[in-house]
């Protein structure tokens, strides 16, 4: 993974140093003022990864169990859960191997650890790209269902959805291979950052347009019922709150990581950028948090899926 400063790499575990005692430390910069560095304990990484792992496994199991959920929209949600699942698995695996190496319970040559590190980095990169793609696919699917409701089932068909899903996974695998092979090339980093900005812009435009259409529809109903102001204001506030949460979580969880990549290109030697580089572990933790929040936003709000989830949990007991 192309990072500067503090980073979670397996090779660093071969010559490990004791972890910081406090979660917040002021890290001195050689050419500038002190920096605030947030140290993320390995136990927290494991806990976040395991919570995300359980959540997303439940989403996949619920969608697989209920045939009523075998539709393009839920297939996109299922693939998002698989992507988040891979993010969690890769980080849990990396943390576990690092802990075993540091404790001396696992002996491995540097070359073997390097290969394992590359595999995990490919898994992380591919799952990140696929997660962003499926977030965009879900936004497009919802947009079509609102603005082209009568034509939705002819536009978003199962064969077309499967082709989109296959294309996303193939593109994610190819992207991860290119990223690991050419991570030290500026163009590769800029393409990843540009991809994130494009997904953010796509989601913002589509969801804002959907909110505007929903408010317009609510105003029409209010005029018929002669209660325009209360209904419109209440619906508008609820829709704006939902939109803020959806886009806010996306930006807060993914933004710092891609800011990190941008600064590697723009100011790799600047003291202020160096302060940001030191918090790379925090940025990874935020991405895992996004994998925890995604099921709450996209999956568990469905009554049908929640009902199926209860059945899955009852069967497991």
From Swiss-Prot:
GO terms for molecular function: melanocyte-stimulating hormone receptor activity. Residues 64-72, 141-163, 212-240, 301-317 are cytoplasmic. Residues 1-37, 94-118, 184-191, 267-279 are extracellular. Glycans are attached at residue 29. CDD domains: 7tmA_MC1R (cd15351). It is a multi-pass membrane protein. Keywords: Cell membrane, G-protein coupled receptor, Glycoprotein, Lipoprotein, Membrane, Palmitate, Receptor, Transducer, Transmembrane, Transmembrane helix. InterPro entries: GPCR_Rhodpsn (IPR000276), GPCR_Rhodpsn_7TM (IPR017452), Melcrt_ACTH_rcpt (IPR001671), MSH_rcpt (IPR000761). The chain crosses the membrane at residues 38-63, 73-93, 119-140, 164-183, 192-211, 241-266, 280-300. A lipid is attached at residue 315 (S-palmitoyl cysteine). It comes from the Eukaryota. GO terms for cellular component: plasma membrane. Signal peptide: none annotated. It is found in: Cell membrane. Receptor for MSH (alpha, beta and gamma) and ACTH. The activity of this receptor is mediated by G proteins which activate adenylate cyclase. Mediates melanogenesis, the production of eumelanin (black/brown) and phaeomelanin (red/yellow), via regulation of cAMP signaling in melanocytes. PANTHER family: G-PROTEIN COUPLED RECEPTOR (PTHR22750). Interacts with MGRN1, but does not undergo MGRN1-mediated ubiquitination; this interaction competes with GNAS-binding and thus inhibits agonist-induced cAMP production. Interacts with OPN3; the interaction results in a decrease in MC1R-mediated cAMP signaling and ultimately a decrease in melanin production in melanocytes. Belongs to the G-protein coupled receptor 1 family. This is Melanocyte-stimulating hormone receptor.
